[in-house]
Regions:
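Residue-level recognition of conserved beta-strand positions in structured domain cores
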Residues: 34, 67-69, 76, 84, ...
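Short beta-strand segments
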Residues: 44-46, 67-72
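Short acidic-glycine-tyrosine-enriched beta hairpin
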Residues: 2-3, 8-10, 69-87
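Short, conserved beta-strand element in jelly-roll/cupin
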Residues: 34-38, 48-66, 103
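Structural motif
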Residues: 16, 55, 62-64, 71, ...
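Ligand-binding loop in jelly-roll beta-barrel domains
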Residues: 84-111
């Protein structure tokens, strides 16, 4: 049994990611991170996960998820399961900052993914989308 200690906040543009549990903490069963999204922030392009599922639990604000062309709006306390292979994206159209927990099962997505994307996105100027796509591919994501 492990108690996770507070970890770094990884900033990808305006979005903040903070891992609470990594796959190494759970024998690979899951990874868990908190995501903070200000209103009208640039968000990830539509994508799908090749090797894992994602479950979202809304903590604060209202976040809209587009999953396989269907628009779903989550309020605090609501959850959403995104199956492996489902094309999805999220956006904060509201006036308050959104916070949600994302659980990755199995726990194969590490903070390294977000660190690598942050290095490209936060470099200044338009992000190198080809480079972001390469990073995504190495970590089990496909742009849609």
């Amino acid at each position: 049994m492990n108690i996770a200690m507070p970890r770094e906040v990884i900033r990808v543009g305006q979005i903040e990611i903070r891992y609470l549990l990594e796959g190494a903490d759970t024998n690979g069963a899951l990874a868990l991170f908190e995501c903070t999204v200000p209103p009208n922030a640039r968000v990830p392009a539509p994508h799908r996960h090749v090797t894992y599922e994602e479950t979202i639990w809304e903590i604060a604000g209202t976040c809209t998820f587009l999953v396989e062309g269907r628009e779903l709006t989550l309020a605090p306390g609501q959850a959403l399961f995104i199956p492996r292979g489902a094309a999805h994206q999220f956006v904060n159209r509201g006036s308050e900052t959104v916070r949600f927990l994302a659980t990755i099962t199995p726990g194969v997505l590490s903070p390294d993914f977000f660190r690598e994307v942050a290095a490209v996105v936060n470099a200044g100027g338009p992000p190198d989308l080809k480079r972001v796509g390469e990073i995504m591919g190495r970590h089990g994501l496909q742009p849609v």
